[in-house]
């Protein structure tokens, strides 16, 4: 269980786990988008060899996007919506937020691909490479600090292959986050749908 936990206290916030787990050799790190995928990932983990960390949020499980339930394949992300120009790649609990952002942007004339990362480690490098063909802006979204997290690894991948695609990382600040209502904390940290939407529009206007 990880991510922002609200009123339990600032030392209970699980915001560094993706960073330190990614450092462990042979470790597989997964994050489900909803309760159905959590069940599927548990079954996948039981039938797999090697260590697997399965990250899920505190609180009631999200039951949206239930129509998207592609088979889990090791190291592969899930394509939820396929469009052009902007690609949103979200981890775990932020898939719900990214879906809301995509719907709002679409109403304003911005087309967005939406990808459920599923795997934080290993990265789906095949998908990341394919995105550069039809997208100018790649946005990563995670409920973890940027340093050592999913977004930083995605940015490093594009830098290593010499891609000129623009990458925006949506993540938590590198700091201890005070206790409080989770939705309020998300807004204060800039990972709520409204704030993310504004950042993407500003970046997209400059493409």
What positions do the PLM features span?
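Conserved thiamine diphosphate
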Residues: 1-47, 199, 205
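Thiamine diphosphate
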Residues: 4-14, 47-207
């Amino acid at each position: 269980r990880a991510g922002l936990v609200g009123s339990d206290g600032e030392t209970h916030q699980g915001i560094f786990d993706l960073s330190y787990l990614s450092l462990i050799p042979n470790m597989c790190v997964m994050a489900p988008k909803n309760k159905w995928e959590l069940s599927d990932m548990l079954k996948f983990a039981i039938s797999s060899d090697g260590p697997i960390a399965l990250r899920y949020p505190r609180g009631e499980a999200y039951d949206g996007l239930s129509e998207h339930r592609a088979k889990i394949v090791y190291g592969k992300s899930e394509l939820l919506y396929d469009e052009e120009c902007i690609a949103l790649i979200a981890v775990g609990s932020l898939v719900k937020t990214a879906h809301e952002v995509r719907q709002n942007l679409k109403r304003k004339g911005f087309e967005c691909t939406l990808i459920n990362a599923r795997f934080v480690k290993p990265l789906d490098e095949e998908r990341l490479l394919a995105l550069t063909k039809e997208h100018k802006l790649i946005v990563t979204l995670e409920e973890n600090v940027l340093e050592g997290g999913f977004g930083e690894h995605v940015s490093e991948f594009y830098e290593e292959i010499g891609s000129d695609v623009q990458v925006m990382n949506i993540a938590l600040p590198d700091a201890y986050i005070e206790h409080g209502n989770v939705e309020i904390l998300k807004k204060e940290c800039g990972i709520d749908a409204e704030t993310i939407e504004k950042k993407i529009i500003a970046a997209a206007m400059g493409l």
